[in-house]
A protein has these predicted regions:
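Glycine-rich loops and low-complexity Gly/Arg-rich segments
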Residues: 46-49, 115-116, 168-172
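Solvent-exposed, polar/charged alpha-helical surfaces in well-ordered, non-transmembrane soluble domains
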Residues: 39, 43, 75-79, 183
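Sec/Tat-exported extracytoplasmic proteins
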Residues: 26, 45, 49, 81-88, ...
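Aromatic-Pro/Gly-enriched surface loop or interdomain linker
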Residues: 1-21, 28, 151-152, 159-194
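Helical hinge/lid and interdomain linker segments adjacent to catalytic or ligand-binding clefts
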Residues: 1-72, 147
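An acidic, glycine-rich "communication" segment
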Residues: 59-161, 174, 179
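Short, low-complexity, polar/charged sequence segments that are solvent-exposed and flexible
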Residues: 41-44, 108-111, 162-168
Length: 194
């Protein structure tokens, strides 16, 4: 089974309901979406859609706590998210369903391995936040996933099937695990917390 060609999505005009998962690579110097587009994104996420934001710059993060929050891609992402109703986020815990949706995974590498995968923080069963986010309460799928590991860069291949971009640090099986992370994310977006 081979994946088809990716299709471009105009988030300001296309019908988003047909896409249960949107992969959004962040470009640091791209203009911020219009207020109307941001409202469409907010509605999409509140109605059960999931957006995977990839800043693709984990390798640029300064070492130590908070280093990944200061990369150019993360600064640009924060500007976008500041206009949205985003729930509290947390690094995907080891027991998160994303670690076992299809493949058993300990982490989520892409071209880079040092970035963390962020998801909606799991509210307590009696938390009012559950009532305010009915789509999330129904299927357990995070409406937002954030990484800096450049998944698409790890997945990209040339026409002859060879990898398009190098991996950093190019650990054994890193690209294979990047594909596995992608499969888990798609399965998670489609099936929820089965």
């Amino acid at each position: 089974l081979e994946a088809g060609e990716p299709i471009g999505l105009d988030i300001s005009r296309d019908e988003l309901a047909f896409f249960p998962l949107i992969y959004w690579p962040i470009v640091p110097d791209a203009p911020k979406p219009s207020p109307e587009t941001l409202a469409r994104i907010d509605t999409y996420m509140k109605q059960g859609g999931t957006i995977l934001f990839d800043t693709r710059d984990a390798v640029e993060a300064a070492p130590g706590p908070g280093g990944e929050t200061k990369t150019p891609g993360m600064v640009a992402l924060r500007a976008i998210l500041s206009s949205l109703d985003i729930p509290e986020l947390e690094p995907a815990p080891p027991e998160h369903v994303l670690t076992k949706t299809f493949f058993l995974l300990r982490d989520f590498p892409g071209r880079f391995t040092n970035g963390r995968l962020w998801v909606e923080a799991m509210p307590a069963a009696s938390d009012e936040a559950t009532e305010q986010r009915p789509a999330r309460a129904g299927d357990g799928v995070s409406s937002i996933i954030i990484t800096g590991n450049d998944f698409a860069g790890a997945w990209a291949t040339r026409p002859d099937g060879l990898a398009l971009l190098p991996l950093v640090p190019n650990e054994p099986r890193q690209r294979e695990f990047a594909f596995r992370a992608g499969v888990n994310i798609v399965m998670y977006a489609l099936t929820g917390n089965y």
